[in-house]
Amino acid sequence: MMSEKFALVLLVACIAFIGIETSPINSDSWKDGFCGENEAYDSMRRGCEKRCDDHNPTFCFKFTTVCWCEKGYVRDKSDTCIKVEDCPNVSENLEFSETIIGM
């Protein structure tokens, strides 16, 4: 009898957990503070982000990024978004591009 109750409680807990994990979030308020400084949340975007040490990325291993540097910012060696002009050894005429992977 005790093991049946335990199994039932465990089953209900698992179903509740799955429901929470798969339910859509109706409010965008959770995004506030989710990303770091100079970053913006974008769950639909895929590709290689601009970096100080790679101004023309062609391939990257990170495909599920949801926090992207805001326009005019790139990632430095510590993965912080900084202004393009603050990158070390960057000429003023250097253009940064990014590779976007289609859905």
From Swiss-Prot:
Secretion signal, residue range per the UniProt entry: 1-22
Glycosyltransferase is among the record's keywords: no
CDD domains the record matches: TIL
InterPro entries for the chain: Ser_inhib-like_sf, TIL_dom
Gene3D superfamilies the record matches: Laminin
UniProt entry keywords in alphabetical sequence: Signal
Pfam families with a match to the protein in the record: TIL
Keyword hit for Signal: yes
TIL domain sequence ranges: 35-87
Protein family (similarity comment): Belongs to the polydnaviridae EGF-like motif protein family.
Name of the molecule in the record: Probable protease inhibitor Egf0.4a
Gene: O4
